[in-house]
Amino acid sequence: MAPPESSHHHLLESGLLEVSKAPSAAVAAEEEEKKEAAAWTPSSSSSMTGRKIKSEASPLLRRLLGGPAAQLQEVLLGTKLYPLFSAVPLAVAAESLRLGRVWVFAFSLIGLAPLAERVSFLSEHIANTVGPTAGGIMNATCGNVPELIIALFALHKNKMEILKWSLLGSILSNLLLVLGSSLLFGGIVNIGKERPLDKRQADVSIGLLLLGVLCHIATLVSKYTSSTGDSINSSSVMQLSRSCAIVMLIAYFGSLMFQLKTHRQIFELEEDSSDSSSSEDDATDKSVIGFASAMVWLIGMAVVTAMLSSYVVTTIEEASESMGIPVRFISIILLPIVGNAAEHAGAIIFAFKNKIDISLGITLGSATQISMLVVPVILIVSWVNAIPMDLDFNLLETGSLAMAVITTAFTLQDDKWHYLKGLNLVFSYIVIAVCFFVMKALPTLKKEDD
């Protein structure tokens, strides 16, 4: 029989423990939310989409399906875009049966949307396995696989204009349309309020994007200011472009080192061992698909993406003539919107939840990857294969890129955001889109004048 005093003391301790659980749980939830928002860097722009869009199947169904079947269900049906996978066999059938090129192009373009989302999901899964530094590089490599593959096929078929337009369109879409929509819809949810904004990752991305714009402008200006002959001028422009590509790559990987290694504490909270929910999610994912399986699926998805990208590149001009839409408009406006639909939707959803820092990570991170990683890699590949390519994106395209980066920089210059800032970015994108649509008449007018 315990003394009354000890029993009273025991009950008092139990009550204090129960009372203390609620504040500690609230603090833990708040820290988890901050950690999720702070974990975004430009090197991991595509990972959050894959993390948030998970399989809706129950654990019981997964156990009943078994190993390979469970992986098939997880990878193909684990996204809300899974109905669009039906466009993949339709594209193959349209190509095999020699149907209209418009159908091949349309089905291929639609099929790229779920493939891009699944590639992001698989690369994020692998990145979580190999560690933060290697994972950041992995996400940087796989985050824009569709754009990279389309660019490589355009390079192989010597369609330089389509190559440059598709890459430019991805940058413009992320900076103006997606970021603008995120600020717009997130601001409407918080109408009448100014929300705080973390500028640290935005400053890094904007600095890299401005460096990329400088390289493009330098190449453009050098082509028109040189007094030497055409062949000498072309050689000088090519040398300048290749030098700039090397500088851009060094700067990009330097930014990765800055964010993932030397100054990592600035961009994300310190990891602790209390991340129980994350470890539970990881355990669930590992029980369905492991590292080796994820690599196999990633390679398979990349192969299918390459096939559809080949269809898009080979049919885009004929589809343009059939639809009466300029190739430049399709390459700059339509391709990026459809190809990155899942990633774009994720950015807007996070803005709805007042997680604008994650939206910044998605949009600015993807734009930075295209500008400072994909573009110079494509140029170096063309250099190795003796294919002439430079950083001159033409006057209108370079001007649009410069204005997009400058407009975004001014929009994010303070630590507040509201819907009007998003509205300005969206309107800027609409003006550029209309410009590329109506400019189709200029070549015809010039020929008639001659």
From Swiss-Prot:
Role: Vacuolar cation/proton exchanger (CAX). Translocates Ca(2+) and other metal ions into vacuoles using the proton gradient formed by H(+)-ATPase and H(+)-pyrophosphatase.
Superkingdom of origin organism: Eukaryota
Molecular functions per Gene Ontology: calcium:proton antiporter activity
Key words, A-Z: Antiport, Calcium, Calcium transport, Ion transport, Membrane, Transmembrane, Transmembrane helix, Transport, Vacuole
Entry-linked NCBIfam families: caca2, cax
Originating species: Oryza sativa subsp. japonica (Rice)
Protein name in the entry: Vacuolar cation/proton exchanger 1c
GO cellular component term, pick one: plant-type vacuole membrane
Encoding gene (name): CAX1c
Gene3D superfamilies registered for this protein in UniProt: NCX, central ion-binding region (1.20.1420.30)
